[in-house]
Amino acid sequence: MEKLLRAVLVLCAATIVCASAFAIESPAEASSNSPAEAGSSAVKQAIQNTSFGGYVIGKASANNQEGATHSNFELRLVRLYAKGKMLDFAYNLQMQVNGIGGSAGEKGPRIVDAWIEWQHWTWARIKFGQMKRAFMIENPMNPWDIGFGTYSQATSKLSGMSDRCGEHDSNGRDVGVQLQGDLLPSARDGHAWVHYQVGLWTGQGINHADKNSHKDLIGGIGISPVKGLSLNWWGWNGRYTSATGITVDRRRWAAGLQYNGAFTLRGEYVHSYGYKVSDWDAENTAWKGSAKSQGWYVMAGAPVTRDKKLRIYGKVDAYSDYLHLDYSTTKTIYGISAEYWILKNLKLQLNLNQIDDNATEHRGADGSYSTADLQLYWRF
């Protein structure tokens, strides 16, 4: 079945790319415009339709954990982008410019998005380049829209952001090709009843070449019975190969629900099978720990003022790095967040969290503590 899906995806990509060559201009346009004129028009359209911008998220944080640094100031994110549309092709180039170059987690300045998508049909759009993996609700969401100061643990650890397997920080992205579309538009309000995504990725994360012949197959489907509500399912069959040549599986599935309307409700569960690179015991040529992990979260929030500038959110966020050990590795975060939109492109966010970390307590450190942070978001 997996080989069949791969073949179908490649065939669809080839078909759409070929079709795009004929869809760029009609026969009448082709007869009236020379190739040079058509090319010049496309370039002008690209220049006119390209927008440039960026955003910055600054953060001041504090905690009461024993043995930890109790306060900090940092630039959480600084990103610049150029995006637009030319004919039927949308494109996006985004860079993250904060961080320390050459850091172990590769958190320095880097390209995060570099993709182009053919969007002639709403039911079949083909995207190629470096982009978000088609896995989970939160992963493709902009940091401005999460409602909290960071993504959930499940999203961070199991969608390729700071992945548990040992992959470098990739912000949920990889290099690949994806087919997606919207099906069955509602006669009442026009929203699509079905959204699907399926793609092949290298499995090595952003800005890295492929290191094995296996391509990660990732896909999902969302059902939207009413506007604003979606029920979603995803699957991921992949492998990651480290710089030292250790290969680990990433076999994962997830299910989630999201509602955006008068209030916001979002929840997801994700299960993963596959060891970490660090789990390999070279001396004994055996794996240690457990190959299974899981995470889940539930969040809800709503505007509390008539102008909707002040919004309050609450969440429960749990992640188990290893399942079926003789002790618990579950880390649970109970959080509340308040954000105030000062202007359209300027907001202030306060996040308060109570953390219960069983794995940290097992190591003899303080695993029950509180954190607070104040974040300032601005766009330009």
Task: Annotate the PLM regions.
Residues 3-64, 380:
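N-terminal periplasmic/intermembrane-space "pro-region" immediately following the signal or transit peptide
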Residues 14-18, 89, 280, 363:
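Hydrophobic alpha-helical membrane context
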Residues 23, 43-46, 92, 195, ...:
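Intrinsically disordered, low-complexity regions enriched for glutamine and histidine
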Residues 27-29, 64-68, 104, 115-119, ...:
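Outer-membrane beta-barrel pore domains
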Residues 36-206, 211-218, 222-231, 299-303, ...:
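Outer membrane beta-barrel
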